[in-house]
């Protein structure tokens, strides 16, 4: 591609930036500005990063004490009338559209104990900060006291990730 001298910005993106929450993919983008001043060959690079945050749930031994349990996530992009639901059998993560600087995500845990525990259904609400290109896993496990018969849950957040850089070469005929 031949360009005149001047200032340019290259932008790359992939995915759809319209879904407030998705299980099938997310939007990534990146850009880089550069100047041409008579060079005959110019190589630039840019880094594309997700504009979504990734959330997962790990339920541990919940079937022992609860007949039903699930988590719903709320964000500003989902609005007040919509949530992303993680059912007890789900395994795929949710990708949540977030504000550029990140935002507080509300995780609401719904618990229905088995009848032998003579406890009412409960809801636990937790809020956690999440930024684009970041992830956390909500770890939920039962907490039962044999002596008192109290049934509850233990909740932890794991913010660990396994980042793998991927280099992509764009053929010149695509430009």
Residue ranges and their predicted role:
Residues 2, 29, 39, 58-61, ...:
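Glutamate identity and glutamate-enriched acidic tracts
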Residues 158-174:
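Short, low-complexity, Pro/Ser/Thr/Gly-rich segments in the mature regions of secreted, periplasmic
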Residues 15-51, 113-160:
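Structured interaction patches on ligand/partner-binding surfaces of diverse proteins
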Residues 41, 63-66:
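Short, structured coil/loop segments at alpha-helix boundaries
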Residues 37-42, 55-58, 70-76:
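Eukaryote-skewed repeat-based solenoidal scaffolds used as protein-protein interaction platforms
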Residues 47-62:
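A short, Gly/Thr-enriched small/hydrophobic beta-strand-prone motif that recurs across taxa
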Residues 1-19, 67-136, 171-175:
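Tryptophan-paired
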